[in-house]
Amino acid sequence: YQIKSNAPIDLFNESQSVIFNGHTYQSEFFKDLHQAKRSVVISATKLWFAKHSSVLEMLKELSARGVEVVAFIKSNLEKEEKLKGIGASIRINDTLAIDVAIIDKSLIWYGNINYLGYNTDENNAIRIYDSALAENVLEVLYT
């Protein structure tokens, strides 16, 4: 006899959900991105790329490694081209209202952090391991 568990699958051997601000999230977010094995889906309501964008470089590296990179954005031709240039698939949604990053369909970064751009201490995000919740968020994005 075995009890079925609905506990989230912990892909990175740690189970911590933590709240971050617009400056403290970067270190952990980049660690999580670096460990991505299959997919990274980012939804960004605003695109503010610096001339040298660390996140774009990381996403380009992931794409080159065979990790599927998908970006949900509002229409912006110049920024779309930058994202296509790093190997990301682009999904345009001009009514986009959610800022989220989902790594390997189980790790969620959710809040008002701009994962593809500029942030301040006023921005925040929560990091959650939950594959069922990740599937629900992906369903919202893709419909």
Report the location of each language-model feature.
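PLD/PLD-like phosphodiesterase catalytic module centered on the HKD motif
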Residues: Y1-T143
